[in-house]
Amino acid sequence: MIVAIDGPAAAGKGTLARRIAGHFDFAFLDTGRLYRAVGYLVLEKGGEPKNEADAVKAAQTLDPGALETVDLHTETVADAASKVAAIPAVRQVLLDFQRDFAANPPGGKAGAVLDGRDIGSVVCPDADMKLFITARPEIRAERRHKELQEKGLESTYPAVLAEIEARDERDRTRKVSPLQAGDAREIDTSDKTPDAVFDEVRAIIEDLAA
């Protein structure tokens, strides 16, 4: 079974995806980490993120499991990630990687949960279950602001909200890789606890598998 979980930043999709994968013993892939991992590997090897050969080589040798303990959320890595993500050949390599992960889950597991921004629409358009997890911008900004503060990073709520609203606008207007698949089931987490969202999705998947 392939479960595609898409949604904007700080909607709660990552937390949900991990819990669903753990509950059903499915393989889990946070696709957002892939571009960061490629950016990190390019820098680690002394390469240039904008250089296609360096970036493609890093993408082709990527082993996400080997980077589980690496902090991929530094500004340097984020900057490198945005540069490698702009290279079509890198996007193609990672698209193939994601599709292979979904079709052949590691460890011989019975299913895969992929969390990202275009899983149901581009990566796995034939996924058995497509979810679009969302929440009001101000709620998502509140969550992200709290998350950054807990990590000891400087953050102000107005700045986080402005960033989230700008990103939402880019997503709404982009023609390539639309965020929400037309046949995805939308779940608004604004006024729901993580447990309530998990229970709702678990029940949907159990019904589907019955």
Predicted regions and their residues:
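Walker A (P-loop) ATP-phosphate-binding motif of ABC ATPase nucleotide-binding domains
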Residues: I2
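Post-Walker A helix-loop "phosphate-sensing" segment adjacent to the P-loop in P-loop NTPases
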Residues: A21-T31, G47-E48
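Short, well-ordered beta-strand core segments
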Residues: D128-F132, A184-E186
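Hydrophobic positions on the alpha1 helix immediately C-terminal to the Walker A/P-loop
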Residues: L16
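Hydrophobic anchor at the beta1->P-loop junction of P-loop NTPases
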Residues: I5
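Conserved lysine of the Walker
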Residues: K13
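Walker A (P-loop) phosphate-binding loop of P-loop NTPases
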Residues: A10
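ATP-dependent small-molecule kinase phosphotransfer cores
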Residues: L34-G111, S121, E138-K146, E150, ...
